[in-house]
Amino acid sequence: MAREAAISAASEITGSQFNPPEVRPWEGNRLQADEDLIQQDLNLIKATMWNYVGLVRTGRRLQRARDMLRELHMQVDDFYRDYAVSKPLLNLRNAVQTALLVVYAAYHNTTSVGCHYRNDSREGG
């Protein structure tokens, strides 16, 4: 069953415009990350998801959230490589990746069902 799911997922990805960032070699060191910066980035993720990816969504808002989160993802990736691994830093890295996955899924799902409601007609999506 896992094999079938992997084949299905791969066929879906092939036709999309998803361009994952290049994976660079690990260059982490022992500097301790500033937890205030981590908290600020977590707050930015929360605000972005609340304001642009809430219950009522539009293509335009989802694109804006995607762009903001992609930029933050690159910054967090650099931050992750420059500092010692810690639980708050891992939580931040996971949060931005999860937020991006939610945005991508919401953007590609144009059908309004359940608590996913697309209101593209008013904003021109």
Regions found by a protein language model. Give the residues of each.
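Glycine- and aromatic-enriched mobile tails/lids
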Residues: 1-125
